[in-house]
């Protein structure tokens, strides 16, 4: 049972870390998008647009990771409930 509790704690910590990273990706996306609008050449504009797109991809990947971690967290919590239920019986 203790190993399940430790896994739950680890997953919760991972979720918090990833949730902290998402706003940074959003901010970076906005930064590069703004830079692309101020760019003075097509080459630099395209570079900044590419970087902005990459930051948006990072944001989406992180959101997907959070959803996967939340599913895993629910599975672990369900396992913990089952273990507790079996101990009572």
How would you name each of these model-derived features?
Residues 1-89:
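Non-heme di-metal
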């Amino acid at each position: 049972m203790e190993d399940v509790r430790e896994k739950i704690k680890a997953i919760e910590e991972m979720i918090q870390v990833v949730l902290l990273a998402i706003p940074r990706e959003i901010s970076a996306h906005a930064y590069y998008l703004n830079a692309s609008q101020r760019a003075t050449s097509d080459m630099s504009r395209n570079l900044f647009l590419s970087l902005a797109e990459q930051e948006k991809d990072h944001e989406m990947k992180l959101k997907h990771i959070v959803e996967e971690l939340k599913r895993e967290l629910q599975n672990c919590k369900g396992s913990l409930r089952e273990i507790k239920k079996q101990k009572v019986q």
